[in-house]
């Protein structure tokens, strides 16, 4: 896969269901720092005009959503989300963030960080790579 850097100032999120003020304010922090904000969903969400609603079907078919089970649960959104984010980043590039993240760096700082790297990972702590 060739390295793509055209979306270094795009923040991507996935959401299903109704967005609360908490998620919207967290996502809005990325817009305020200069990111384009894409919210990927299988639903027709009501979003602030600064955000772009993207059809999650372009990344993974809806049927995949409930295929992942863990400990006899009905479905495991965390497992699906992991697969979705990797597929998204292969197809669209840009950045992936969970909706509980708040942006404190500018889009320009993120773009500079990744300008000559094929990928960037965040650390959760000294021994774990974070995936949000």
Spans of features found by a protein language model:
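N-proximal low-complexity "stem/linker" segments adjacent to membrane-targeting elements
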Residues: 1-13
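Short, well-formed alpha-helical segments that are part of the catalytic scaffolds
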Residues: 19-31
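GT-A fold catalytic core of metal-dependent nucleotide-sugar glycosyltransferases
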Residues: 77-128
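Short, hydrophobic beta-strand segments that form beta-sheet elements in well-ordered domains
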Residues: 34-42, 95, 100
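Active-site-proximal specificity loops/subdomain of glycosyltransferases
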Residues: 42-83
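Short beta-strand/turn micro-motifs composed of small residues
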Residues: 13-15, 41-43
